[in-house]
Amino acid sequence: MYDLITGDSIVSAEAVWDHVTMANRELAFKAGDVIKVLDASNKDWWWGQIDDEEGWFPASFVRLWVNQEDGVEEGPSDVQNGHLDPNSDCLCLGRPLQNRDQMRANVINEIMSTERHYIKHLKDICEGYLKQCRKRRDMFSDEQLKVIFGNIEDIYRFQMGFVRDLEKQYNNDDPHLSEIGPCFLEHQDGFWIYSEYCNNHLDACMELSKLMKDSRYQHFFEACRLLQQMIDIAIDGFLLTPVQKICKYPLQLAELLKYTAQDHSDYRYVAAALAVMRNVTQQINERKRRLENIDKIAQWQASVLDWEGEDILDRSSELIYTGEMAWIYQPYGRNQQRVFFLFDHQMVLCKKDLIRRDILYYKGRIDMDKYEVIDIEDGRDDDFNVSMKNAFKLHNKETEEVHLFFAKKLEEKIRWLRAFREERKMVQEDEKIGFEISENQKRQAAMTVRKASKQKGVNSARSVPPSYPPPQDPLNQGQYLVPDGIAQSQVFEFTEPKRSQSPFWQNFSRLTPFKK
């Protein structure tokens, strides 16, 4: 290490933990930051640089990149270093090596080393913290422990099985010949358990924050750490490890693929494993984003007048699409103009106020789990006795009930049909990984709405749809991307006939307050 630094080699390290400090000569960073190591003469404290900032930092808070090389400008996957002993407690650097097999061996050894260290962290959490907490019924309830630790024991059991299979595939004599790609593919479904843990992590942090205000809990958790002989990291740092770990797999596999020759027996398996793990992390991040947006859904529901039935969050967590259409509920029924909000599992129907177009009234909902979508060709419908254009139906598979919808334009109809397919796909994926909103998260969203109502006043709320992802293709440009604070009258204005307003109504609405 010292030879590399004094030899003008660029030695880079990645932060494994957040280092929060107020000291002038210490370097603050977050997990994932890349640090240029300038001095490693002290085994415990190194001197490093991030951008223009330099300072001391704990050596145990970082991991050295597997491969280091001179003059690197491409990032962590393009940096090279010497051999890594997977059984050691640190990464040992030697002279830069250009041999591709050696580079692959370095990455394999790093993967094995980090997996073994990760298993130890999980064991420390389960035995050092969770096991001790269960003994103190006077301090922790079962519900509290579920919030704080989530499904960490399930993750521990899964990782032990995963590492056992990795060890079987590891070639100790020639690490570059190891075939670990199939292990990721065989266990790909098991990695979805991280979704529940990541979704719960924010609740865990909030619960810990409340407990840590009491010195009893501070002393208890510190005693647990010392008893288990764990490194000097707070409990919230240990609980962050699984979240960081699942995000690291695509980075490690991408680096492994780079140093794997295409004629290597493991190449196609590593490539497939990289695609799988990227999809897992992408879906986990997407579901975490959805949970972060549930406050907006709760706020939107609170702004809709005359709400009836269960809350949106009881079944749904994402607004997929919204728009205004003509709707006929039953044969020979009257054509009605409604604003529709398609969530996962349900579609909510609302009616605009006749004068205040930014105010919505609740008019019902459709359970999408019971309905199928039927595309209808233009022409006459004998059942409803109407001429149809840009129409589609929702058919209840149990009761044979049918709803008929008319879009303004063909493009809008296509967007709705695509949205319905997306809704079904989302529901199936959520069921596959067991995604759901916890009762604690629902309570937090409700509290946020109540606080906002007290601050702004109930009458100031407007029926603005919650945000959702941007369009994926040109056809989706018709989606209503509504930032917070914009009234719906601005959003849906194009669907209303243009007419000038009488001065009488302008004066009336200004001078005569009344309750809707």
Swiss-Prot record:
- Give the DH domain ranges: 103-287
Sorted alphabetically, which CDD domains does this protein's record hold?
PH_Collybistin_ASEF, RhoGEF, SH3_ARHGEF9
A GO molecular-function annotation: guanyl-nucleotide exchange factor activity
User: One Pfam family name from the record?
Assistant: SOS1_NGEF_PH
| PTM-bearing positions, type Phosphoserine | S502
Per the entry, what this protein does is: Acts as a guanine nucleotide exchange factor (GEF) for CDC42. Promotes formation of GPHN clusters.
> What is the recorded name of this protein?
Rho guanine nucleotide exchange factor 9
| Organism, as annotated | Mus musculus (Mouse)
The record's gene field reads Arhgef9
